[in-house]
Swiss-Prot record:
Cytoplasm among keywords: yes
UniProt-recorded name of the protein: Mothers against decapentaplegic homolog 9
Pfam families to which the protein is assigned, alphabetical: MH1, MH2
Polar residues bias (residue ranges): 202-221
InterPro entries: Dwarfin, MAD_homology1_Dwarfin-type, MAD_homology_MH1, SMAD-like_dom_sf, SMAD_dom_Dwarfin-type, SMAD_FHA_dom_sf, SMAD_MH1_sf
Domain MH2, chain residue ranges per copy: 236-430
Length: 430
């Protein structure tokens, strides 16, 4: 090439195959990135007989059955496109179906897919029509009885209550993902890629609506109920940052379903990022300073399909205390779970919370109020706390955050308001 030829001309040629595939691209953002992603894919598929034809058939006839279109799985499962790494099925689902796709937690494979990402085979299917987007389940309303006639048999709440009513241990128990999660009560559903989490416990029957047929053995009989519905708030959570027992900075209100909390600085006030590097504290000691330097990329929170996931994208582990997560896995409510770098954990399940709340209303105001503890998640960066660490409380860790889940908290508030005053008023000494 002549020395005077602009470097940009090296990238100006787009092959006919890439142009054809880009014709099905969704959205108009990041044209160059999409072009490079498709070009990278075409080079891989041309080595496989019929793969290009199958992909074009799937894209041109989205309602028709299609075969898997696979590429080799990389060592870490990710694909690099123009200095950005991502999971291959997420990249191509974003290009051809959902431009606003944020995470693999939002995708589940169809039953017809033989090489879904979660199967950990040598090949991974990138056919965007072999995946579906996770839908947020509709939560049934909580039916608050005017007069309780509840027979507490087979209650999901029993285990939660018995554990919660005892005093907290001096030092919380510890668990590490994935080792401590292997012996869970239920196997992971095959549609949950890369996770060994059980599904939430199966619900017992919900209370019957007034006027609906009632089973003779139903625990809810002849009662008059007021339905209290779940409503999705504008900000699904708020995040407060602490150093030891000192609150630092303003509370971050999360409106985006994908939120990054990192140790860097971002003066642009990106609504998807909470940058802890921006926050100052005159009482900061050397331990805190050193810990802050290791937060790095921090934690990625996803709110998908009524579930909250925490993904550790820092080079150092994060430590999470979530009562909802602990309940799902049969741990003590105060257990602190270690999430190593590169791993993610489901830290809240709205459907499980709905089941517990629906049952708790029949046990009284105080038991419902106890569920407020389930709506707060504490998370420490770099340094752990609990029985296996010299720090026994989260307020002894250098850098930590407290996450309040607004939807469940507001639902609780409406249920408590409907229930009226407690028989034994809650106080600081109760």
């Amino acid at each position: 090439m002549h020395p005077s030829t602009p470097i940009s001309s090296l990238f100006s040629f787009t092959s006919p195959a890439v142009k054809r595939l880009l014709g099905w691209k969704q959205g108009d953002e990041e044209e160059k990135w999409a072009e490079k992603a498709v070009d990278s894919l075409v080079k891989k598929l041309k080595k496989k007989k019929g793969a290009m034809d199958e992909l074009e058939r799937a894209l041109s006839c989205p309602g028709q059955p299609s075969k898997c279109v696979t590429i080799p799985r990389s060592l870490d499962g990710r694909l690099q496109v123009s200095h950005r790494k991502g999971l291959p099925h997420v990249i191509y689902c974003r290009v051809w179906r959902w431009p606003d796709l944020q995470s693999h937690h939002e995708l589940k494979p169809l039953e017809c897919c033989e090489f879904p990402f979660g199967s950990k085979q040598k090949e991974v299917c990138i056919n965007p029509y072999h995946y579906r987007r996770v839908e947020t389940p509709v939560l049934p309303p909580v039916l608050v009885p005017r007069h309780s006639e509840y027979n507490p048999q087979l209650s999901l709440l029993a285990k939660f209550r018995s554990a919660s009513l005892h005093s907290e241990p001096l030092m919380p128990h510890n668990a590490t993902y994935p080792d401590s999660f292997q012996q869970s009560l239920c196997p992971a559903p095959p549609s949950s890629p890369g996770h060994v989490f059980p599904q939430s416990p199966c619900p017992t029957s919900y209370p019957h609506s007034p006027g609906s047929p009632s089973e003779s053995d139903s625990p809810y009989q002849h009662s008059d109920f007021r339905p209290v519905c779940y409503e999705e708030p504008q900000h699904w959570c708020s995040v407060a940052y602490y150093e030891l027992n000192n609150r630092v900075g303003e509370t971050f209100q999360a409106s985006s379903r994908s939120v990054l909390i990192d140790g860097f600085t971002d003066p642009s006030n990106n609504r998807n990022r909470f940058c802890l590097g921006l926050l100052s504290n005159v009482n900061r000691n050397s331990t805190i300073e050193n810990t802050r330097r290791h937060i790095g990329k921090g934690v990625h929170l996803y709110y998908v399909g009524g579930e909250v996931y925490a993904e550790c994208v820092s080079d150092s582990s994060i430590f999470v205390q979530s009562r909802n997560c602990n309940y799902q896995h049969g741990f003590h409510p105060a257990t602190v779970c270690k999430i190593p770098s590169g791993c993610s954990l489901k830290v809240f399940n709205n459907q499980l919370f709905a089941q517990l709340l629906a049952q708790s209303v029949h046990h009284g105001f105080e038991v419902v109020y106890e569920l407020t503890k389930m709506c707060t998640i504490r998370m420490s960066f770099v340094k752990g706390w609990g029985a296996e660490y010299h720090r026994q409380d989260v307020t002894s860790t250098p850098c930590w955050i407290e996450i309040h889940l607004h939807g469940p908290l507001q639902w609780l508030d409406k249920v408590l308001t409907q229930m009226g005053s407690p028989h034994n008023p809650i106080s600081s000494v109760s």
